[in-house]
Amino acid sequence: MAPTTITALAKEKTLNLDFVRDEDERPKVAYNQFSNEIPIISLAGLDDDSDGRRPEICRKIVKACEDWGIFQVVDHGIDSGLISEMTRLSREFFALPAEEKLEYDTTGGKRGGFTISTVLQGDDAMDWREFVTYFSYPINARDYSRWPKKPEGWRSTTEVYSEKLMVLGAKLLEVLSEAMGLEKGDLTKACVDMEQKVLINYYPTCPQPDLTLGVRRHTDPGTITILLQDMVGGLQATRDGGKTWITVQPVEGAFVVNLGDHGHYLSNGRFRNADHQAVVNSTSSRLSIATFQNPAQNAIVYPLKIREGEKAILDEAITYAEMYKKCMTKHIEVATRKKLAKEKRLQDEKAKLEMKSKSADENLA
């Protein structure tokens, strides 16, 4: 299937079958049924060790990471005007005509640009979203030909936004390092040379949102993800393997911080890798901007501290590139097994119907 854009499909009365998920994967909680279980942590006073705020912030982050692997931060130092401008420009990009957005399509292995939905290898349902990706750090990784030229001001604003998020990411890594009982700079050192990828998600309104997902259930592979979401709602989290879900309460100007697989392994499993998904709705489009703070490909992945009585959750040290490959292989294997099981179930149901039909014909004869 090659839709022009998801925005175009949003005008249909029924959901295209390529986006329909199995019943057990469909949303269990509404996009706006908000929960206050994810803590909102003020970073005010973080840079001033004299007032005792830093240890208190560390304690709150420890609890959040042990419970969910997710927390929200306010008083983070990112200018509200920059946040508003980044959000405005992002919405203006997705409002462009399809042919202008498709000038930056990522087909053919292009690195960065505009993507219409995604489907995991082995999966059989697509995500209800469009997104733009750009790689901003290290700076020599930037390919400005893949950064949209419209709307005006996109490049200059995204450069500033990326720079400010790098600073915030560095602060958060220091606090997380202390929260793990390490020296302030240990987590940053373990990343070797921090990479940054920014992914801007746009979720158009959906004709049948109860049948699909904006983004399938997953964990992020990197160290941390810093997410800016609008006030619509749709980010959901689980901590019991997907049995129950909560919708994260949007907070004006806040950033949601997710711990990724890399951070989970470095903490020796003490801190959860945030298990999350995104749902959509039929009344309001939604925008979120995810900034992935990832280690270098050659960074070594192994617990930085193993507490007394614990065992390492990894058998041996591996590189981040190897860890990423293993995680993706596992996701693909799970999706493939599920797809094959579904196909077998459908075949069995078809065979039963054929048997019933044959039996009915014999009775009539």
Swiss-Prot record:
Keyword Transmembrane helix among record annotations: no
GO cellular component: cytoplasm
InterPro entries named among the record's database cross-references: DIOX_N, IPNS-like_FE2OG_OXY, IPNS-like_sf, Oxoglu/Fe-dep_dioxygenase_dom, Plant_2OG-oxidoreductases
Subcellular location, principal: cytoplasm
EC number per UniProt: 1.14.20.5
Localization annotation: Cytoplasm
Family: Belongs to the iron/ascorbate-dependent oxidoreductase family.
Name recorded for this polypeptide: Flavone synthase
Source organism of this protein record: Petroselinum crispum (Parsley)
